[in-house]
Amino acid sequence: MITDVDGVLVGHWTDADARTGCTVVRFPEGTVASAEVRGGAPASRELELLAPHRTVSRIDAVVLSGGSAFGLAAADGVMAELEAEGIGFPTAFGVVPIVEGLSLFDLGVGDPTGRPGPVEGRAACRAVAGGAHAVGAVGAGTGATVGKWRGREHATDGGIGASSVRDGEVIVAALIAVNAAGDIDDGSATADPVDLGSLRPSEEAFHDDGSPEMTNTTIGVVATNARLDKNGCLVVAQGGHDGMARALFPPHTTADGDALVAAATQQVDADLDLVRALALIAVERAIRGLGGGLGRR
């Protein structure tokens, strides 16, 4: 789990009736982060701040939420909670918490008016803890589904997946909210030639105006105890997306808003290519741990 990285904490807020929620990942002081978006329809907050050429290097928390772009408001509650704790980027006029937001589209699954907001984000932030955390239909993964590109009748549950891998002292871990248009590829089948007809989404997956019937997005956080700068964290986020591409078929579609934040807590020296490779494995395992769908293609 991502909490295997020392100092990383996770909290969930879940509305099982509305089938939505949010998940907060908090980091220890001094954590550096960057991010990468590969999906065509992202809903995000403050990601540009994590670009390597931007000034601020620190990160305090990431909020993963349902509710599509409405759910980004959950980060307001997390900022308020961290400000009350005195955590954030110091200025002459008080601290400004560095909180990134990523949201997935679950409005068509439960109650579309029940999306997370500031109160729910603050509740998830107050619930953070180390050690084992809940996975599956919880937090941002409560209303998550997969397999929708072949039509609504093929949709199955997604959710929150988690994994961690080690190489000596180096730990890389992932927490992923899986709400993909594509299927979870369990990797069990042999690499047979792809049937090109199977690559065409079902007409039932779209409304008459061409818009998707159920929309999507897989979002998450990769954390490592390695000492990395923002450029290194960007490379790790890219490795995480490679893991997403191994575990989902098809990945990164125009109807997905796939995005990952990669955070480094600066505790041990590590080779960047090793950390990137471990990120690939961690994300792949986190997604596949939610259950199989397709065999590998």
Locate predicted features.
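A structural signal for small-residue-enriched, beta-sheet-centric alpha/beta enzyme cores
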Residues: 1-69, 73, 80, 84-297
